[in-house]
UniProtKB/Swiss-Prot annotation:
GO molecular function, one term: heme binding
Enzyme class name: oxidoreductase
Localization in the cell: Endoplasmic reticulum membrane; Microsome membrane
CDD domains, sorted: CYP17A1
Pathway in which the depicted protein is active: Steroid hormone biosynthesis; Steroid biosynthesis; glucocorticoid biosynthesis
InterPro entries registered for this protein in UniProt: Cyt_P450 (IPR001128), Cyt_P450_CS (IPR017972), Cyt_P450_E_grp-I (IPR002401), Cyt_P450_sf (IPR036396)
Entry keyword set: Endoplasmic reticulum, Heme, Iron, Lipid metabolism, Lyase, Membrane, Metal-binding, Microsome, Monooxygenase, Oxidoreductase, Steroidogenesis
Residues holding substrate: N202
Regulation acting on activity, per entry: Regulated predominantly by intracellular cAMP levels. The 17,20-lyase activity is stimulated by cytochrome b5, which acts as an allosteric effector increasing the Vmax of the lyase activity.
Record organism: Felis catus (Cat)
UniProt GO cellular component terms: endoplasmic reticulum membrane
Protein name listed in UniProt: Steroid 17-alpha-hydroxylase/17,20 lyase
Function: A cytochrome P450 monooxygenase involved in corticoid and androgen biosynthesis. Catalyzes 17-alpha hydroxylation of C21 steroids, which is common for both pathways. A second oxidative step, required only for androgen synthesis, involves an acyl-carbon cleavage. The 17-alpha hydroxy intermediates, as part of adrenal glucocorticoids biosynthesis pathway, are precursors of cortisol.
Gene name of the record: CYP17A1
One of the protein's GO biological processes: hormone biosynthetic process
Amino acid sequence: MWELLVFLLFAVAYFLWPKAKCPGAKYPKSLPSLPLVGSLLFLPRSGHPHKNFFKLQKKYGPIYSFRLGTKTTVMVGDHQLAKEVLVKKGKEFSGRPHVVTLDILSDNQKGIAFADHGASWQMHRKLALATFALFKDGDQRLEKIICREISLLCDNLAMQDGQSIDLYLPLFLAVTNIICLICFNSSFKNGDPALKIIQNYNEGILKTLGKDNLVDIFPVLKIFPNKTLEKMKNYVKNRDELLREILEKHKENFSNDSITNMLDVLIQARMNSDNNGAASDQDSKLLSDKHILTTIGDIFGAGVETTTSVVRWTVAFLLHHPQLYKKLQEEIDQNIGFSRTPTMSDRNQLILLEATIREVLRIRPVAPTLIPHKAIMDSSIGEFAVDKGTNVIINLWALHHNEKEWYRPDQFMPERFLDPTRSQLISPSLSYLPFGAGPRSCLGESLARQEVFLFMAWLLQRFDLEVPDDGQLPHLEGNPTVVFLIAPFKVKVKVRQAWREAQAEGST
């Protein structure tokens, strides 16, 4: 009995003790590390993780490492090193780590966002990009879809003229419908039960992922009861049940002659692989219902809360800077007026608005730390060796708040993106990657940029958004989960008198 116990202890120690690194190789500086727990006891336990990692950078340098349990993670906070990881050696660092909570969310790394590098990820990313190509022209043009939903949003807000409201739900509905039209060619109305399901599981998943989950560091803990994991499983179950119902209806009505949305593209790809026989058997397995559902879930997860969050952050900063709000309205009045609504063709004229959006994406990046990458082979970052299987995290917050790259980085200054004459947009620093870069970059970047620009241009043209009568300004600290969320806040919505008069004049 004792011999067996000693053997088991030695076996555990062997597998959990840090393995010897390549002799002679130079590795990044590391936080102190203990057997079994790694650097866990030496990492700050309070505050925002991205800020804590940024502070550690001042002690350990722009690239350093730490261990969580048995896994080594390299933290990168320099734009040149970040681009080496994401672009120059993008394929070498294109993997995703296995994490218990993310494996639940992605059904063991299916889909796009959390899938490891391989045939499945490549196929689904390619098909998602093919879907966006469907929306380049005609009535299905992406801009038309976005503007239709923004028009409905503005009508909704106009009915609440003079009231103080939280913009989250109206924005969530509009952005969700844009994604729904891309994915299913359908949309929801306010109060639709399905919309409530999406909202609930979306918020639940973000809250769950935002918690410190020890089970992600010590996977063996998943054998014990875990409320967080049970909640995550329930949210994913609700998501998949809703999406499966939509998928089944889509299969019934599918026509190979009418490919108009992402589900059509995915179903068509599976049918083509089924018809090609044994040669495409592997492709068919990678296009199972579970794979399709996870990919659609990824598009929702990446496309809804992110855009909604950026628009809300932009409004929040403008409430703190009312003079800038007026300047933005003046820019729109001078270049567009009130006889028509803003379009993407106005983007080159509305340079102050574009500079403001860029500054919001800098000072409050959608994801302060990018989704972790994983080295799929032995590689290097700068002068440092990185072993296969090492996790690599890009601290986007560090890139966007580096005092050597940005003047007064903690201050909201849209003018930093304008030349001295305030007549042209500029790139003041290369340390700016709001959507990542390389093969793992955000595939919805173009959609997100269009959405944020058009949402803000329409809102500025039609409404005065003001601080509520109680004088409560939005808190700008935020809550970092997978997405950097702003705390709920209210804004007083007032239809602009100039807009009202122009509409009355146009109707006579």
